[in-house]
Amino acid sequence: MPFTLGQRWISDTESDLGLGTVVAEDKRTVSIMFSACEESRLYARSDAPVTRVMFNVGDVVESHEGWSLEVKIVEENGGIFTYIGTRTDTEEENVKLREIFLSHQIRFNKPQDKLFAGQIDRMDRFALRYRALTNQYEQHKSPLRGLCGMRAGLIPHQLFIAHEVGRRYAPRVLLADEVGLGKTIEAGMIIHQQVLAGRAERILIVVPETLQHQWLVEMMRRFNLHFSIFDEERCVESLADATNPFETAQYVLCSLDFLRKSRRRFEQAQDADWDLLVVDEAHHLEWSEDKPSRQYQVVEALAEATPGVLLLTATPEQLGRESHFARLRLLDPDRFYDYDTFVEEERQYAPVAEAVTRLLSGEKIDDNARKTLVDLLSEQDIEPKLRLIESSDADDEHAQTVRHELIDSLMDRHGTGRVLFRNTRAAIKGFPERHLNMYPLELPSQYKTAMRVSSMMSGSISAEQKAIKLLYPEDIYQEFEGESATWWNFDPRVNWLLEMLKANRNEKVLVICSRAQTALTLEQALREREGIRATVFHEGMSIIDRDKAAAYFAQEDDGAQVLLCSEIGSEGRNFQFSNQLVMFDLPNNPDLLEQRIGRLDRIGQQRDIEIHVPHLEGTSQALLAHWYNEGLNSFEETCPTGRAVYEAVSDDLIALLACEKHEPEALENLIEKSAAMHHELKAKLDQGRDRLLEIHSNGGNAANDLVTQISSKDGDTNLIAFSLGLFDTIGLNQDDKGENAIVVTPSEHMMVASYPGLPYDGCTITFDRETALSREDLHFISWEHPMIQGGIDLLLSEGVGATAVSLLKNKALPAGTLLLEMVYVVDAQAPKSSGIGRFLPKTPIRILLDAKGNNLSNKVAFEGFNRQLSPVNRHLASKLVNSVQKEIHVLIAQAEQEVAKELVTVRESAQTEMENSLQAELTRLQALKAVNPNIRDDELELIESQIQDLTGYIGKAQIQLDSLRLIVVSHN
């Protein structure tokens, strides 16, 4: 390379160094000083990774003194360029600027500048950049954004609720599904959508203390949302960074008790400007008109100060009407201002729900029901619709459509339809059956002796303490024998468990017991006696260790056959891949029993659940098993009445459990009384069901359509190819581990020091939803995952693939024929929270010009064209660019005219789509406001101002050249 002192060069590998100056050279080396960052580099002269900087006529260059010059003439003397032209500030002509006096800070940010400066990237990177832009655009435009990327099964009612609520601005809703239907996942999906759409940047989740870690893990594992748990210690630590500790994190998780106990922390939380508040277990907030609880007041104040609120609660039937009203009051105190008015309103909707039940079941609609429907939908003539439904076959497609139109209209007018979602198992299909297998086993003599001696020595303990003690004879035995007691050598439940596991070698078995020590002892017994692979899961383990245990259990090959859990194993972890549940002992209340079964009996479970209950005859264990089974039927069915019945009969039950000898008659009477109460309460709950609300909450066909649409996107080969190309370009190591899993780790040759979303020691990823669901240690990669979103942002911001030169081997065209491919981006500069991404995200426009300026982009698709091209080495690429620089300038100018026309079309299309969408919603809500007071004024005002703001942003959208590729036809 010919180097001369004073010449200006740029580094090909370190473009951020700015403009360099040759300060020394000899036969073998050259030294270049980069004054902008006060660094110098010594290169081997023969292959220095630098490019000569030469500006052309028409360019505007900056001097080191800060003034700019529009170049008219370029002169060269002794290898040094002098630029002659007009100063832009004083308009003085024929000003000379020698290249040594150019600004050191000049960087080549425009693609054409990079191309002319020889900063030419690889062809595959250009293609990757274009794909990144098009995929990013498609994801922003997708109505399913925020729903496809979560690590969860595709459950219709969950997706429907999340889709319905997640697209609203500042949603304020009550999620009141029955247990096991996935309220936490629904809330997570809503949060995820709000975050991706930019509607929620600051989120506060308030939960009972025991559920903090569960929520932390769920949000991180399922939605890649990283929350921080705030307690007193964290608040004190944060004081160094801010006066209000809650302003030091965007996503905060804390316990309700923490805010209740400290007025100062509560006030700080209240002042922290949240966009979205989520409250779990909201049914525990006690309220009465004259005396609301402190917890209720805390949530009420936070809800008042926060635009969006999600309350997760028990079903309205379980809550009772007054308590249900108190939750609604938190969401909209202006609308739900008086309890008696609310009760009267609810009463008026009862005949509507009855009419809808008849409508759906195909029963004849009597005159009363018909009158109810006609009165409520007075603004439309529904008589023809009713006649069509009654005269048509129940499966007739047109009649089905009309049915759903009627239901949608009714739902919009329903008292709480917009703010309350509630699904019941009775209304949702897809739950497996539960089969109970009871195994009465003989009580060992060792236990008999220990229990007798313990009874003599226990003195005056309460009946409740005694009852609990008698449920766990192994603990009583251990009290006398000490730590070295080997009760597992003679306990028949252990022998039964070993035989059961040997008989079911290919099954994954979940064993739950009340205490951590029991789980640890059983693991030792299984290992030492039969070499059975087992793992434990208890409260003494860290979250990471629990994750590892769960992953070991989930592993198909070489995984554990058994997971031994203490009671916390039935909190928040789901193991749907197993259908075998062993209860080594029994919990002392029905809610915990349901929680245990709920680890396997969840929506999405594919097989019937086998519940195994080994119990020692004549003990409290046996008595409790019979009461659960015959009094509540809580093994084989979910039991919404369990707590109410338990509280009513608990004195009698505890008295029986505390007896060493059980009277069969007393047990019989208790079971009879409990069963009668259970059936009576269940009938009442069933009668109180609001069929209209159920129909709305489960989403019907719309919910199934969502599942179909998302399923069709799962396993997208385009995503897999793009992701692997992205990781390769950034410099990540990839190691295929089989079983749909790839290990991704950082390398020494990465483009950046750390990669977004990738732990420093790497991670294992999968593109398969089912694999991700069965193995919690894997990251589920989708277009929404931080590793992909962050990778695309990195690729675009670092200018990767902004320029390229390729050869087209085509003998049908003359050799040397020139083509220029340019990618422009339409960008509306607007806050993310405005919702611009839904209508006008960054939009790529591809222009492919031949040498005559004809635009071939509509005739020549990108991928097919790209496959016909060959790469060119950088040295040859620079030569080609320099030889046709004038032609490229002309083509870029022609492309600007072409893309200006496209910009008008893109703006008009975005404006029309925005108006159609938002204006339709505004018109609908304005019409409904007359018949449904649940429509809030601020909702209408928000849509009106949004239409106005978006119109301004769309009208000001600009274009920018993002990347370009020179293509030269070759016959070689």
UniProtKB/Swiss-Prot annotation:
Sites where the protein binds ATP: D177, E178, V179, G180, L181, G182, K183, T184
A GO biological process held by the record: regulation of DNA-templated transcription
Gene Ontology MF terms in the entry: ATP binding; DNA binding; helicase activity; hydrolase activity, acting on acid anhydrides
Keyword entries, A-Z: Activator, ATP-binding, DNA-binding, Helicase, Hydrolase, Nucleotide-binding, Transcription, Transcription regulation
Domain Helicase ATP-binding residues, every copy: 164-334
SMART domains (UniProt xref): DEXDc, HELICc
Family: Belongs to the SNF2/RAD54 helicase family. RapA subfamily.
Subunit structure: Interacts with the RNAP. Has a higher affinity for the core RNAP than for the holoenzyme. Its ATPase activity is stimulated by binding to RNAP.
Protein name: RNA polymerase-associated protein RapA
Provenance organism: Photobacterium profundum (strain SS9)
